[in-house]
Amino acid sequence: MVLEELHNLPVGELAIIGMRGCEDICASINRYLVSWRKDVVKKGLIAPSIVDEYTRDSYMLDVRCPRFGTGEAKGMITSSVRGDDLYIIVDCFNYGVTYRMYGQEVPMSPDDYFQDLKRIISAAAGKPRRVTDIMPMLYECA
């Protein structure tokens, strides 16, 4: 590997988790990253030895936080995150997302989102190279 190529080496493979309520913005981010990274490869700005790890058809990972009847939940990541640079995007102020508790629809509170975030980090079990949480306030009203 040539020394000039080293400045373009990512630390780990990119992976994005979009929590419930952030699906649209995460899909936009994913489309942009796929297009941008393919462009970088096409221009020859990335080391040829890591092109396969650098580009993907999608950087989104499928995760679930199923709820039990009592409102408790568990975090599940359906693919490997070993060695990835993991970005988790969660909007803690989106009251449009609901779940069933004791037979009633209940809006998710900021604490519910934060607990789900902790569940997903725990489900990753220390395997990602780095974990970055992005918590924009997308739906906050004045």
What are the language-model segments listed below?
Residues 1-142:
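PRPP-associated nucleotide enzymes
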